[in-house]
């Protein structure tokens, strides 16, 4: 018979995850000890190990729970059955909202995945690919010509480049908030998407041939 968890276990666990994410984001995963996490959370180190067996498991939970929320956004938007543009706009808005509420967790996800154990890293990277594939599929539905030209993945990654790193420079204020930035990101993306020609890869390939083929795509 499984041992019952004490009342408040999940609340304490979520608090530990939040405080650990803050420390990892501020100091870096490698520079933060479990002693510091325990002190930050106001618990003893033995008590901390009651919730997480080691620091790597703590990191894995932070990354996977953040990704789970992002995957939930994708599934909720897909369930609405929207046309490609409104679906992409809604995903952008929801992603920006999630990032605004989880800036520490997002920084940890983007900067500390390399410290994960192999199995955990594989799961996290597959979770990221799921999200990228979903957005890329919507872009492909909107511009099938660009899909045939091999441009959908690069364009999708350019979009993620706009929103994934906002935490490094954008500070929400009274005049410009995360909510206000989301449609700006969408307008920039769709304005640029309409200007992209399906022959662009041919031009890049031609230039690569001229310099000995030293240029590589995103996947190389």
For each of these PLM feature ranges, what is it?
Residues 61, 75-101, 155-159:
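Hydrophobic alpha-helical connector segments
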Residues 1-27, 32-43, 57-60:
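Basic, helix-initiating cap at the start of DNA-binding domains
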Residues 90, 96-136, 145-150, 168-170:
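Short secondary-structure transition hinges
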Residues 1-11, 18, 22, 149, ...:
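N-terminal intrinsically disordered/low-complexity leader segments
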Residues 71-75, 118-143, 153-157, 161, ...:
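Amphipathic alpha-helical packing segments from all-alpha helical-bundle domains
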Residues 60-66:
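Alpha-helical DNA-contacting segments of helix-turn-helix folds
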Residues 97-101, 105, 137, 156-176, ...:
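Amphipathic C-terminal alpha-helical segment
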Residues 42-52:
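Short hydrophobic/aromatic patch on the recognition helix
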């Amino acid at each position: 018979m499984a041992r019952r968890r004490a009342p408040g276990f999940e609340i304490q666990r979520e608090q530990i995850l939040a405080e650990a994410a803050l420390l990892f984001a501020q100091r870096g995963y490698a520079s933060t000890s479990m002693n510091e996490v325990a002190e930050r959370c106001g618990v003893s180190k033995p008590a901390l190990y009651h919730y997480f067996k080691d620091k790597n498991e703590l990191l894995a939970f932070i990354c996977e729970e953040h990704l789970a929320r992002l995957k939930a956004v994708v599934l909720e938007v897909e369930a609405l059955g929207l046309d490609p543009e409104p679906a992409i706009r809604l995903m952008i808005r929801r992603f920006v909202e999630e990032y605004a509420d989880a800036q520490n967790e997002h920084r940890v996800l983007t900067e500390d995945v390399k410290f994960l154990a192999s199995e955990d890293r594989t799961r996290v990277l597959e979770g990221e690919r799921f999200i990228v594939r979903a957005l890329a599929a919507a872009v492909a539905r909107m511009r099938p010509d660009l899909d045939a030209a091999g441009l959908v993945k690069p364009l999708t990654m350019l979009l993620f480049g706009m929103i994934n790193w906002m935490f490094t420079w954008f500070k929400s204020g009274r005049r410009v908030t995360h909510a206000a930035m989301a449609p700006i990101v969408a307008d920039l993306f769709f304005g640029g998407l309409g200007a992209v020609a399906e022959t662009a890869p041919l031009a890049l390939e031609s230039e690569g041939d001229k310099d000995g083929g030293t240029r590589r795509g995103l996947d190389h």
